[in-house]
Amino acid sequence: MPLLKSLKAKLLRAFAKRMKGKFVYDAAQYPLRAVTEEFIPSAWGPARALFYWPNTESAQPLPVYLNLHGGGFVAGVPEHDDSYCRRLAHNLGCLVVNVDYVLAPEHPFPAGLRQSFAVLEWLAEQAATLGIDPQRIAVGGHSAGGNLATGVANLARGHQRLRVVHQLIDYAVLDLAQDPALKLSSLDKPLLGAGLVRFFNSCYLSDPAQARDPLASPLLATVDELRGMPPATLITAEYDILRAEGEAYAEKLRRAGVTVTERMFAGCDHMFTHLGPDDSAEQAWQLMEDGLRGAFQLEAVASGAEALA
């Protein structure tokens, strides 16, 4: 591994860790039964994951949301999504599993993807012990995490022991084969620039030819390869250089017969759900929450409870 690449990756990770406190909610805002740290076995070593347990009296197995953080496959930590995970666990009564997957360049494609899928399979295997429903699992992520999430959903198609019922794809990188210089924004200096994307891609792909693999570049999957994918909530931002590939992926999913709820947020750039504007971020979080609520069929359960009250 080139020394300069390794050093730059470590600097980005150090910055990401310093930033994690910015995204952690006061626990009192969304009270939960517990947040626990688990280590899940995988071929790449134990995968650290934060489990957000809802404070629910339901005797029914819990639905599960598997969250994959962003960071260009190179940096980022699950704590960046802490506020989001607390909100979903509290508001939906689901178990949220926030995964600290292995990072490039030490662990290039497909390690992070395959480890995330291994976590999903472990959850299904441990469903009875954990008290979860392996037939009501959703996956999602932001930026690079959105890429991994839709890849995990693809790998899970037709699985015998689990079912992914929804995918959240939030301003995701979906085409690693396209020259980053061709990914344009109307801003002179968008938050995510071509140079940084090029660096992330060089770390994640040990061979540039891997960029053509649909599991690395979901947009390059054929329509037939996307048939049977779960419904999606897909979010893009007006000024984000990844906007066009997100919109193209939404259209390709629709051509494959997949139900897609899509929204482009005007006046926003990459990572706006975490950095603001706050009004747009709140609308995006609510859109994602609503997508999961419908997928988990919580509205029907709530309606039934009200009818019996």
List PLM regions with ranges:
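An N-terminal boundary/leader segment
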Residues: 1-2
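Alpha/beta-hydrolase superfamily serine-hydrolase fold, recognizing
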Residues: 5-7, 11, 23-309
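Disordered regulatory segments flanking catalytic cores
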Residues: 18-19
